[in-house]
């Protein structure tokens, strides 16, 4: 069986952190019931929060021995938050890194009941040390034209059927990324850069020759908001796509700002 560390960075996510953690715990319970998980820890980091995120996380995890909530006002980037949480979890669990998996998600994301189990099964079946899944939006919050543009961006990064079975898409989401701990440590973990720590980690694994699965079969549901918490995160990416369409609210706001008064 496998040890699992689930990493959940959270910044002012009081409205969504409860659903995120309930989903993570249910998925861990299901994986345990199927004999896939021996021990686990859920590492939540309340990063520079000014709302009730920390309190709500503690309330959801009360009575769950695997639940741990840390308060962090020092880390400069979400990459640093993810990395430090991963290393805390590994230190807490102990045991060989080759038998421990790090699963990363976000505090505005809902994972399914099979999430943990599917990752571990697919990793074993495909003989890989990292699994990059997909993230579906709960609701598009931009314009109709922006929604079409986003769909086109998604489709452009999907690989055709019948190609490399390990490389089914070119997307990377910190909300749905798993890495075996020995491989994670081998490449230095999540970078502490301003953004793009998920892509950088996957690129480092590939460059080091570690086998990686980019699968369409494992997906989570994440917020479709256009204003997020992390610089360079998904919300900023969505807003940029929406802003490029001529009839979007973002484009209208930009035109208004550029209009002389």
Language-model features and meaning:
Residues 13-34, 55-56:
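Short, well-formed alpha-helical segments that are part of the catalytic scaffolds
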Residues 148-169, 242:
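Short, flexible, basic/aromatic active-site loop/helix in glycosyltransferases
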Residues 54-96:
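Conserved donor nucleotide-binding strand/loop of the catalytic core
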Residues 14, 43-55:
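A conserved acidic beta->alpha catalytic loop
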Residues 52, 98-99, 105-121:
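Acidic donor-binding/catalytic loop of UDP-sugar-dependent glycosyltransferases
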Residues 114-146:
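Conserved donor NDP-sugar-binding/catalytic core segment of glycosyltransferases
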Residues 195-201:
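Acidic donor-binding loop at a coil-to-helix junction in glycosyltransferase catalytic cores
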Residues 33-48, 71-74:
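Short beta-strand/loop segment that forms part of the nucleotide-sugar
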């Amino acid at each position: 069986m496998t040890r699992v560390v689930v990493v959940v960075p959270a910044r002012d996510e009081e409205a969504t952190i409860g659903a995120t953690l309930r989903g993570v715990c249910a998925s861990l319970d299901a994986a345990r019931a199927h004999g896939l998980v021996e021990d686990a820890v859920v590492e939540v980091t309340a990063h520079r929060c000014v709302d009730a995120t920390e309190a709500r996380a503690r309330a959801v995890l009360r009575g769950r021995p695997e639940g741990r909530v840390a308060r962090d006002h020092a880390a400069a980037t979400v990459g640093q938050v993810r990395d430090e949480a991963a290393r805390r979890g590994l230190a807490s669990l102990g045991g060989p890194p080759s038998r421990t998996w790090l699963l990363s998600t976000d505090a505005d994301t809902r994972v399914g009941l099979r999430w943990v189990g599917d990752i571990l099964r697919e990793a074993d079946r495909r003989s890989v040390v990292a699994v990059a899944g997909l993230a579906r939006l709960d609701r598009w919050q931009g314009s109709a034209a922006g929604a079409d543009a986003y769909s086109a961006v998604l489709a452009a990064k999907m690989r055709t059927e019948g190609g490399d079975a390990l490389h089914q898409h070119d997307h990377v989401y910190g909300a749905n990324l798993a890495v075996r701990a020995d491989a994670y440590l081998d490449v230095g973990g999540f970078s502490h850069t301003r953004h793009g720590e998920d892509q950088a980690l996957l690129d480092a694994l590939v460059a080091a020759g570690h086998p990686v699965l980019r699968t369409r079969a494992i997906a989570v549901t994440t917020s479709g908001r256009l204003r997020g918490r992390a610089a360079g995160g998904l919300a900023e990416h969505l807003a940029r796509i929406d802003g490029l369409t001529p009839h979007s609210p973002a484009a209208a706001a930009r035109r208004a700002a550029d209009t002389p008064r």
